[in-house]
Amino acid sequence: IEILTGDFISEVDENSVYLGEESMPYDVLVWAGGITGREPAANSDLAKDERSKRLHAESNFQTSDDRVFAIGDAALIDQGGDEQAPPTAEAAWTAAEVAGENLVRALRGAPLKSWQHTDKGTAVSVGEDAVAHDVMGIPVNTFGGLAARTLKKAIAARWIAEVSSPKRAISAWSDM
């Protein structure tokens, strides 16, 4: 399994996927791309990516209009240089706390905090199977099987515990 991120797919045929001028053969292609900005944002006067219509935001979530904040997969959040935060649930989850604080800070006229995404790796599940890649603190680059399935469940349980309660996360474990 090879996971590629950050490249625009220009074409797909029955044998190959094309990333710009380069082609790569595939047996099974799972394409999870296509994230675009919402129509109201696309039609706004805010600075946005012309291709995806996602809003450009500074690391404090402010857009070209300092009264408008953007977060999650609706935004290209500056991470320094030419880098933007990935449009993942993990990034949105960690960004949300700082973005929420910044809304309050903006209302009070206080300085805004910057946010920097820390990539902790990727865990993907398809049906009963899972694969994990580049997971922080684990010396193996890519792995699957029981370890990846357990990691994926633990990520979901952590989220449930955070938004609900640890008791609910424990009771949901067997259904994940």
Predicted regions and their residues:
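FAD-site-proximal beta/loop scaffold in flavoenzymes
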Residues: 15-94
